[in-house]
Amino acid sequence: MINGLILSKDRACQLRLLLESIRVNAPELLDDIKIIYTSSNENFEKGYEKLKSEQILPNITWQKEKDFVSDFLTALKTCESEYICGLVDDCVFYKRLPTSSKQIIASLTDDVFCFSLRMGLNTTTQYYMRNDVTQLVDYQQNPFCVKWDWKKWSSKLNYGYPISLDGHIFRTKELCDLSHKFKFDYLRQWEGVIAGKCREETDRDKMVAFRQNVLFSIPVNCVQDPPLVAGQLYDQPEEEINQKYLDGEA
């Protein structure tokens, strides 16, 4: 059983695309989905109210964020599934999963820390660094997935960075225990802290992914503080996208 945890801020329209892509391309991946969302003004809140009313998926629990750290840790602690898939609102499943969730779970053997839906042999660009990705050479494979030693990679590179909520599947208890063990104040800090500490905290030195990824992020804007690299090629401010969504144009 895999549950989903989605984080969203000011991007109801982009979240809608993610939910629609789950419905079309990964309808049986997630048993239950919790969405923790926040809005910085009334217009963004209207976007989320519109999205809720559309009921794109039947298995969603909505939670308005009050305190990010507390809400996030509680969501991990109260998650009833053995596995959890982290997602953020600018992710999209762009094609069908090549296998079932049972096979994904079966690939999470004792030596595997996480399963990445975002990585694959076709992953060629690391948008945060704005450069080409060093390709996997040393890996194991079967007909649908590849496995590699993430501890042999720099934590600044995708293949050495297992702690991500952009489509990574973890053992819920393991991720929960790690998250409660170290202090953080916001999402990027959580990723950075846990990414560094987990190299020492876990003996699971492998990551697994489909041979070709099924999900990517669309960084056309950034709502995080401090900001990430976003929108260099195709800048779409979240305010404009939200207004088009409210007006029925998106």
Task: State each model region's role.
Residues I2-I6, I22, D31-I36:
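Hydrophobic targeting segments
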Residues R11-A26:
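Short, well-formed alpha-helical segments that are part of the catalytic scaffolds
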Residues C13-L15, S40-E49, S100, T124-T125:
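Short, charged/polar "capping" segments at the starts of alpha-helices
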Residues I36-I84:
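Active-site-proximal specificity loops/subdomain of glycosyltransferases
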Residues E82-V92:
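Short beta-strand-to-loop acidic/aromatic patch adjacent to the donor-nucleotide binding site
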Residues I84-G86, F113-R118, I169, D205-R211:
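A structural signal for short, well-ordered beta-strand segments and their strand-loop junctions
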Residues L97-K183:
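Conserved catalytic core of nucleotide-sugar-dependent glycosyltransferases
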Residues G167, K173-A250:
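C-terminal catalytic/acceptor-binding lobe
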